[in-house]
Amino acid sequence: MTSSTFERTSVSQKPRLSLSQIINMSVGFFGIQFGWDLQRANMGPIYDVLGAKPDDIPLLFLAAPLTGLLVQPIIGYLSDRTWHPKFGRRRPYFFVGAVLSSIALIIMPSSGSLWMAAGLLWVLDVFGNVAMEPFRAFVADKLPDSQLNRGFIMQSLMIGLGGSIASASPWVLRNWFHVQNTAAKGIIADNVKFSFYIGAFFFLAAVLYTVFTTKEYPPADLPHDEKAQESNKGIGGGVSEILSSIRNMPPKMRIISLVQFFTWPGLFLMWFYYAVAVAYNIFGATSDTDAAFGNGKDFAGLTLAYYNVVTFLFAFVLPYIADKLGRKATHAICLLIGAAGLISVAFVHDRNMLFVCMTGVGIAWASILSMPYAMLGGVLPADKIGIYMGIFNFFIVLPEIMASLGFKWVMNNLLNNDRLLAVQCGGYLMILAALICFFFIKEKKNETASEPLVDELKIIEERSV
């Protein structure tokens, strides 16, 4: 897409946005996270129902990291070079990704075989990434540096809210509306099916809300004709620029990327195994057709919803802490708290103690979704924010790909296919990430938020979750 001449707004002249404008540009993340958390909470049980063994699960989840690795930098590269006077720069990707992801969510619970579900997960993850990746660059496009913390933390609020509702949906449908949570062998339960239908609606509606209520600034970082010409160089030119950007990555981004490299496997292992582990190890299920399995996976979803509520609430406190301690110290402490939550899961016998474990995970998740991006905000070149956000994602998905391909051996040979021990391993990796964050990231004294974020966030704090 190209445009004729237009007025350019320099990065230094970006106007400050009101709280309502920041909310409008973040609502889409509510829908996107609704879709992500539906699959995180339910794909493990769905695979189990369709006949997967515990050591098969990592490979079946390969879609998430591999599509992130391939799709996000490409979408970042293309969206940096997209402009239309009516549809903007990032919003066309939001729209297309949301429509096709919603279709995949509707079809997913009708899967009749393991490989049909796995194939639909690939479709969902490809177009989920198309919708999601430009949102990070969208914040940097729209907000001045003094509001970057606020923008990314608002995304954390939306992510926490969307994730909590999505994860709790099967439990709510079963316990409030008496929708069945068990089914015949190889059939996905009705409460999971209806959760996916609800998720498809929220995914599409929330993203469309952001698309139609938020305007974008014309690209001002380079003459847009030059960027349009660059976009016509084809795949080879795009790959060349991605490789060049990796070679010239800002030093601080390298260290933050290493922190991400060890953080995300911990979360990935939890999403692999947690729900089914709760059903078998804590509720005592013996097969995927008995009542204990249905109740266990639903309760696990409820605790996952709870950690998203913790994320939502802790996001109000996070600005205070970041202003006082600095971004890197705040992030390191939150990671250690999350690690404690993951490690302690393996020692739980009383199901209600899982809420204590998930409190730690929710605190870490709030920081993971905001602090790394806030630390990056001032070090990326303005003309390459989209592509660098995609590259940053490499260091999330590469360890996840390694886990998908190699954790089968670990489960068989080291963990005796114990799902709870797999979750615990993720906690130890998160400790390593926290140590790297605290000791190796260099942070200037004035690099905390340039002003308190509290005043505007207090308006939201008065609302119910």
Regions found by a protein language model. Give the residues of each.
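C-terminal transmembrane helical hairpin of 12-TM major facilitator-type secondary transporters
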Residues: A322-P372
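Intracellular juxtamembrane helix-capping segments at the cytosolic ends
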Residues: V130-L143, S367-P381
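Loop-to-transmembrane helix entry/capping segments in MFS-fold secondary transporters
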Residues: P54-D55, D145-Q155, K297, L380-F392
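Helix-loop boundary and gating motifs at the non-cytosolic
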Residues: E7-P65, R254-V259, T263-D288
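Hydrophobic core of transmembrane alpha-helices in multi-pass small-molecule transporters
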Residues: F30, A104-M108, G112-A131, M353-S367
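C-terminal ends and interior cores of transmembrane alpha-helices
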Residues: F94-S113, L336-H349
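Helix-to-loop junctions at the C-terminal end of transmembrane segments
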Residues: L70-F87, L313-R327, M411
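Intracellular loop-helix junctions on the cytosolic face of multi-pass helical membrane proteins
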Residues: M1-S20, G112-G119, V130-A131, F135, ...
